[in-house]
């Protein structure tokens, strides 16, 4: 077998920024029927119209039925190939059908003793798997496994075959099955230029049978500049979540597609097209949330705070689900998700790592919803309490606290939605009406 690149424990996860697709159950069930008295005729009540809901979804996570149009899917934020080692394989190398095809598989439910050597042997067969690199994510304090890792293959075809063959199959020397999925970042791809535009669009209402290739073909037939297409899959079932993203190389074609392709059928359903927000904008203006410039100015002057508030979480997101995308950016001290609050807190060891995570993940999709990030308050930074026992807060912290953490809820910018009149505002939060 050809040489395999195995990353050492000392390598920071920053060199290989990899994130898994978030696994989530289906949407919450509809409202139960309302009991009526026997002497009254029984009817089948329907849930109240969305505009009757006057409470912020952060306080009522059970009402958050559908996410707002998500951000550009993470595979489009491509990263430098620091440790990409090619080796020869039998036959011709597979040429990607189009740019952006993923070659990296996320491996979950790893036991503490499962290291890179174990993964290498587990995925190697007589056919000689074309493995490029391996990495088990470890805790920097004690070196223990975080329970997941990544395996990059030479081509998308090989990775796809491994995913189909091994997912759910028994792991060697254990009685547990493999838990595999596509990684959200492909380590073999080149990162987009920081100053380059991210010309992506959101595509919703996709039929269950729509694949990456079909979505790409649907748009590339009319727009030659299409570079990539991605259908978001559920990590547990492997089925489509009903939406995806298409990235263009030409801004004019992207603009035309926003209008011309809206309502066009892909497979058996008409597509719903929406804008995907750029990765980087002034004042952190993001689709699904808008961070006032004042909050960003305050955070720039605070070089000690390393805690990030994460708003807009759905109730099925776990601590581990929240930790995985953030762990790409550096060492994490703690992750907390208050029960029933629709939010969480992630505390980093280093300030620069927290700044990068806030910039890159604000407005991305974690679970089934777009999250809104802002600076929280480190538990060590105590604030005086008012006469009601509440922590003193100023406009930056927004009056929200949990277990010593303070946070603000960024306000959405309705102008970012092409159908703003049809997206009611609940308590200052943008929520999609399905």
UniProtKB/Swiss-Prot annotation:
Residues annotated as transmembrane: none
Oligomeric form and interacting partners: Interacts with the poly(A) tail of mRNA in nucleus.
Region Disordered: start-end pairs: 1-50
Gene Ontology BP terms: cellular response to heat; mRNA processing
GO molecular function ontology, one term from the record: poly(A) binding
Main location: nucleus
RRM domain boundaries: 103-185, 199-278, 306-378
Protein name per the record: Polyadenylate-binding protein RBP47C'
Gene: RBP47C'
Compartments reported by the entry: Nucleus; Cytoplasmic granule
């Amino acid at each position: 077998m050809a040489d395999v690149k195995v990353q050492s424990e000392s390598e920071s996860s920053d060199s290989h920024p990899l994130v898994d697709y978030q696994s989530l159950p289906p949407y919450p069930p509809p409202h139960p029927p309302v009991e009526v008295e026997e002497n009254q005729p029984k009817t089948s009540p329907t849930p109240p119209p969305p505009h009757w809901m006057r409470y912020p979804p952060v306080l009522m996570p059970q009402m958050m039925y559908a996410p707002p149009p998500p951000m550009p899917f993470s595979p489009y934020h491509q990263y430098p190939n620091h440790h990409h080692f090619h080796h020869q394989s039998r036959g011709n190398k597979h040429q990607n059908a189009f740019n952006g095809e993923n070659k990296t598989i996320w491996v979950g439910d790893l036991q503490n003793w499962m290291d890179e050597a174990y993964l290498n042997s587990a995925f190697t067969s007589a056919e000689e798997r074309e493995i490029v690199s391996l990495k088990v994510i470890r805790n920097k304090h004690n070196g223990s496994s975080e329970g997941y890792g990544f395996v990059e293959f030479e081509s998308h075809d090989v990775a796809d075959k491994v995913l189909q063959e091994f997912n759910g199959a028994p792991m060697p020397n254990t009685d547990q099955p493999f838990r595999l999925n596509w990684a959200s970042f492909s380590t073999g791809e080149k990162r987009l230029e920081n100053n380059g535009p991210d010309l992506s669009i959101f595509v919703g209402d996709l039929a269950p049978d729509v694949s990456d290739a079909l979505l790409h073909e649907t748009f590339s037939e009319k727009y030659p500049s299409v570079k990539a297409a991605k259908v978001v899959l559920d990590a547990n079932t492997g089925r489509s979540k009903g939406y995806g993203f298409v990235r263009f190389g030409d801004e004019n074609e992207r603009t035309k597609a926003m209008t011309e392709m809206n309502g066009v059928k892909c497979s058996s359903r008409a597509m719903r097209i929406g804008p995907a927000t750029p990765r980087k904008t002034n004042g952190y203006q993001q689709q699904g949330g808008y961070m006032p410039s004042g909050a960003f100015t305050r955070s720039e002057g605070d070089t000690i705070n390393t805690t990030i508030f994460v708003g807009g979480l759905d109730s099925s997101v776990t601590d581990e689900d929240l930790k995985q995308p953030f762990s790409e950016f550096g060492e994490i001290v703690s992750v907390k998700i208050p029960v029933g609050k629709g939010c969480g807190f992630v505390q980093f060891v280093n300030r620069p790592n927290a700044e990068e995570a806030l910039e890159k993940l604000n407005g991305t999709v974690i679970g089934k919803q777009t999250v809104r990030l802002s600076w929280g308050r480190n538990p060590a930074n105590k604030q005086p309490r008012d006469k009601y026992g509440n922590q003193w807060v100023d406009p930056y912290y927004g009056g929200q606290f949990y277990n010593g953490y303070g946070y603000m809820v960024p306000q959405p910018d309705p102008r970012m939605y092409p159908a703003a009149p049809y997206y009611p505002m609940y308590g200052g939060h943008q929520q999609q009406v399905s």
